[in-house]
Amino acid sequence: AAVHDAWLYVPYCWDNTNAAPDNVSSDFNGVRVPYVNWYHDVSNFGAYRDHIYGLMTYNVTDLYQTGVNNTALFAREGTDAKISPAGFTLAVVYEDSSATRKQIFINEEFDILGADQGNYGTSMAEATAYVPFSGAIIDTENVVRANLTTFVPWGNDGEGNLYFNGEQIGTGVWSYGPRAVGASDNPQVAVDEREVTAYLNATGNE
């Protein structure tokens, strides 16, 4: 199989010095790479209203090496800068003409969600992110299996309801593991994967 695409995703938090995107750098396999997309959000409420959370994405297709350990280095510029990355995600899409046909839809964005009327003034309905998928039409009659995989940085234990095409398919979905403050071996990124074949549409999946 040949590599079709390789993308590096770097989520971060605690950026109250506006370090991202221009005062941070990312190297992949020793080569400085520019970010392609930058998504960010801020609560604007409470004690941490000015602490920006975000996601930076990098196209590393030409630098990715199969069969070896690939390395990524994320650094801030300036000793007074405050920015804390979570675990990186490296998504690699392969193509193989001898394999069965696959359709892969990738939607990248970033939102801070918190449902708490007392502390944030937000309801469950307001603290909802919508993720529409666009692309080629799906031949639903011939689909063997469809999986939905979600990545949620700092998704706490028992947190999050998951819907697909209007159907609730999970409750308390995301948990990144033991809570940690400061330097940690925990990637602090919750990953969930589940089958959605029964709810799949030919177009307009969300």
Label the model's feature ranges.
Residues 86-206:
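Helix-biased "structured C-terminal domain" signature
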Residues 11-15, 76-79, 151-157:
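Short, flexible beta-strand-to-coil junctions
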Residues 20-30, 103-109:
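Short alpha-helical "patches" and their helix-cap loops
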Residues 1-25:
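Solvent-exposed N-terminal domain segments of exported/luminal and surface proteins
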